[in-house]
Amino acid sequence: MTQTNFRSGPDVNGLFGSFGGRYVAETLMPLVLDLNREYEAAKADPEFAKEMAYFQRDYVGRPNPLYFAERLTEFCDGAKIYFKREELNHTGAHKINNCIGQVLLAKRMGKKRLIAETGAGMHGVATATVAARFGLPCVIYMGATDIERQQANVFRMKLLGAEIVPVTSGTGTLKDAMNEALRDWVTNVDDTFYLIGTVAGPHPYPAMVRDFQAIIGKETKEQMQEKEGRLPDSLIACVGGGSNAMGLFHPFLDDASVEIIGVEAGGHGVDTDKHAASLNGGVPGVLHGNRTYLLQDGDGQITDPHSISAGLDYPGIGPEHAFLHEVKRVEYVSITDDEALDAFHQCCLLEGIIPALETAHALAEAMKRATNLRDDHLMVVCLSGRGDKDMQTVMNHMAAAEKTQEKLV
């Protein structure tokens, strides 16, 4: 890891090393180029920054706390663990940070309709929320499989006025929802703004979503200085597409003393075909407008991911994560469904916080590591979302485990 400036990407072509870029249909190219121009202009406009700051503070509820997880720290008997409390945001996750930024950009561009894809439903809820706030019609593409396991969020989106389009192609999950959203965008290029929910897609989306999420890491830096007088020693976040992780990581990338760990969904184990760990079990390829690591078979076809967590159930990862993996600035590991469920329960019992199953993957890795670290090691875990949406999934798994136990007895 000889490079010292890890925050300079992407280049003018949207590349982070060999990853990223703009792999889109000819009809979309003028649109993404226009979006890039508008975003660059918005970044340079103090009025845009002022409006962003207003909504982040008074609508989203930022800054959210950096919380010392005292009982979890005692339980692990090692590192001092802090939670960055993104689940306290309006709508219950980090997704709203990005949605506020993109809806303000859509408004600036004069777009009259929003579309989005969603997996766990949190990005769908956040998009429906900002659509309601700004009086824009909104269509959410969601895989039929995810609709089944995220009924509460589907109802929330409908309450907020969104139209939900079930996607039955493929496995009916996030990848398929994104495919359908891209088709909609091609058809309705003039009036529609595609509000992508993660650090993927064609340039400028990976950089734009990262920039809107970087408030997570910026606040963490300031809050840790206030609380401990120094930088944290390690950062841990779950990674699907990777927006909460990139939001936490990016402001720290050039701080060599800070160890950074991204946690992928290991499903039933990365040695099986039932996981969603693109970096630990995938190879480079092109999907959804960018080159990144993807789960593929021997013929280069995208394979079906698996995770107990709908938000991590994606066969790719943001291109900047792929770059950071290759240059070894960030370590990417995987956590299985069972490990995530164990951490989910521990967090509930020890801290009185019900985390999202996505977040539970990061918590599981944090607990593994904390036990072997000194008590002056400062660790920050991104609590990316709350677990209300996952109650049915957890109930089903607990019921299945009880049945298995009964059979054994």
Swiss-Prot record:
Residue positions, PTM N6-(pyridoxal phosphate)lysine: K95
What class does this enzyme belong to in the EC scheme?
lyase
Keywords (alphabetical) are: Amino-acid biosynthesis, Aromatic amino acid biosynthesis, Lyase, Pyridoxal phosphate, Tryptophan biosynthesis
**UniProt xrefs under PROSITE patterns:** TRP_SYNTHASE_BETA
Q: Cofactor(s) for this protein?
A: pyridoxal 5'-phosphate
Functional pathway: Amino-acid biosynthesis; L-tryptophan biosynthesis; L-tryptophan from chorismate: step 5/5
Q: Which reaction does it catalyse?
A: (1S,2R)-1-C-(indol-3-yl)glycerol 3-phosphate + L-serine = D-glyceraldehyde 3-phosphate + L-tryptophan + H2O
Provide a Gene Ontology MF annotation, just one. Answer: tryptophan synthase activity
Provide the E.C. number(s) assigned to this enzyme.
4.2.1.20
Task: Spell out the GO cellular component terms annotated for this protein, sorted alphabetically and separated by semicolons.
Answer: cytoplasm
Q: Which CDD domains match?
A: Trp-synth_B
A Pfam match is PALP
Q: Which HAMAP family match?
A: Trp_synth_beta
Functionally, this protein is described as follows: The beta subunit is responsible for the synthesis of L-tryptophan from indole and L-serine.
Q: How does it assemble?
A: Tetramer of two alpha and two beta chains.
Q: Which family does it belong to?
A: Belongs to the TrpB family.
Protein name per the record: Tryptophan synthase beta chain
Q: Which gene encodes it?
A: trpB
